[in-house]
């Protein structure tokens, strides 16, 4: 599932006619992750009991309110040689999601580019939060790639979501990428890379999920 297999039963073909691929692994303080590590508001969402049952709906429901009401530790994200001061949310992924995906809800086209994808969100009110979800508030958004991300805080420990698991880690927290570290056996006869999904319309998705 973590590698986006829509038909797990077909993976059994790899046992008798498989091809080995190498994909990257992320790591947070040495703990490996295939998908992402989340900080700030993102980590609060991962700790929600509803998250495991419906990831997308939980993100859509909680993200705007958490962004504007966040009162957790003050974070500083060191992304390569650059620093983002006091973002409310930081998402570090094993390779990048699409530019319209601010919360790791979509697929990644590749897992072998040897980089971390990084998203940070910073808003000061509800209007800015909605504009950010519409991708109109680019000043509150950082999207980039790096080989290393270090997250500092004004507390000795911070919540971190690692591939959907909620953890408490000592600061600073260091995220790295290990190119080609994971060997994956896949069927020789398999689908190609899927066409990228259309641009996320966060506001439309929110209204569809919560029409009231």
PLM regions: where:
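Short hydrophobic-aromatic micro-motifs
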Residues: 31-44, 85-94, 98-100, 117-120, ...
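Conserved active-site and cofactor/substrate-binding residues in soluble primary-metabolism enzymes
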Residues: 6, 10, 40, 54, ...
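ATP/nucleoside-binding phosphotransfer catalytic cores, i.e., glycine-rich phosphate-binding loops
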Residues: 79-84, 110-113, 120-212
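Oxyanion-binding "anion nests"
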Residues: 71-112
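A short secondary-structure junction signal
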Residues: 44-49, 101-104, 131
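Accessory alpha-helical/coil subdomains and C-terminal extensions
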Residues: 53-81
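Small-residue-rich beta-alpha loop regions that form the catalytic core of phosphotransfer
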Residues: 1-55, 180
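Gly/Ser/Thr-rich active-site loops/lids in small-molecule metabolic enzymes
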Residues: 51-60, 98-126
């Amino acid at each position: 599932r973590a590698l986006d297999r829509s038909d797990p039963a077909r993976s059994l073909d790899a046992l008798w006619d498989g091809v080995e691929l190498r994909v990257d692994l992320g790591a947070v303080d040495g703990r490996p992750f295939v998908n992402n590590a989340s900080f700030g508001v993102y980590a609060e969402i991962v700790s929600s009991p509803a998250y495991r049952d419906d990831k997308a709906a939980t993100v859509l429901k909680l993200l705007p309110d958490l962004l504007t009401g966040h009162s957790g530790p003050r974070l500083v994200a060191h992304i390569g040689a650059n620093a983002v001061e006091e973002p409310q949310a930081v998402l570090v992924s094993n390779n990048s999601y699409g530019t319209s995906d601010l919360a790791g809800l979509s697929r990644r086209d590749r897992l072998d580019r040897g980089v971390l994808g990084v998203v940070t969100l910073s808003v000061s009110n509800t209007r800015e939060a909605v504009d950010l979800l519409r991708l109109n508030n680019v000043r509150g958004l950082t999207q980039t790639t790096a080989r290393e991300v270090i997250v500092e805080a004004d507390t000795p420990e911070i919540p971190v979501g690692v591939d959907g698991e909620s953890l408490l880690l000592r600061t600073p927290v260091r995220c790295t990428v290990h190119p080609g570290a994971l060997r994956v056996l896949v069927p020789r006869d398999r689908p190609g890379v899927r066409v990228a999904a259309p641009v996320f319309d966060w506001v439309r998705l929110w209204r569809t999920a919560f029409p009231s």
